[in-house]
């Protein structure tokens, strides 16, 4: 698996089992260095305008999914998913089992008291957060 991110996130990507590649300019070349024949699938979770590159790397629109770029998906014919709300309870139960077994963890990047919700929102909008932002309710 190949994961893209800033150099500051590369150790984390390795911890997740991915080979890190810098995102942004040169991303395609970095992926090609690791996968000269391209990749089997590409998942866009950032919505940063890379769908044309992902289509080329994955060999076509049928091998690309985005959860972050609705307009780009329409423009390029890529599948877009918001998830399947009908399966949400089933998936939540599965995640709970994985957490209990120690096979899944969700890293917390930063916590905020509910009164600081505006600051939490600003931090999230700025990006570059590793882990989830959590609002604490007293």
Locations of the language-model features?
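Terminal helix/beta-alpha structural elements that buttress the NAD(P)+-binding lobe
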Residues: 1-138
């Amino acid at each position: 698996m190949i994961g893209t991110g800033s150099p500051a996130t590369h150790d984390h990507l390795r911890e997740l089992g991915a080979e890190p590649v810098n995102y942004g300019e040169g991303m395609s070349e970095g992926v090609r260095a690791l996968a000269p024949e391209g990749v089997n699938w590409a998942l866009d979770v950032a919505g940063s305008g890379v769908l044309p590159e992902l289509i080329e790397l994955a060999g076509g629109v049928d091998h690309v999914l985005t959860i972050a770029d609705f307009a780009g998906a329409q423009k390029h014919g890529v599948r877009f998913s918001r998830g399947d709300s009908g399966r949400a309870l089933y998936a939540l139960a599965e995640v709970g089992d994985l957490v209990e077994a120690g096979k899944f963890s969700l890293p917390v990047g930063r916590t905020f008291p509910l009164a600081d919700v505006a600051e939490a929102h600003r931090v999230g909008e700025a990006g570059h957060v590793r882990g989830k932002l959590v609002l604490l309710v007293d």
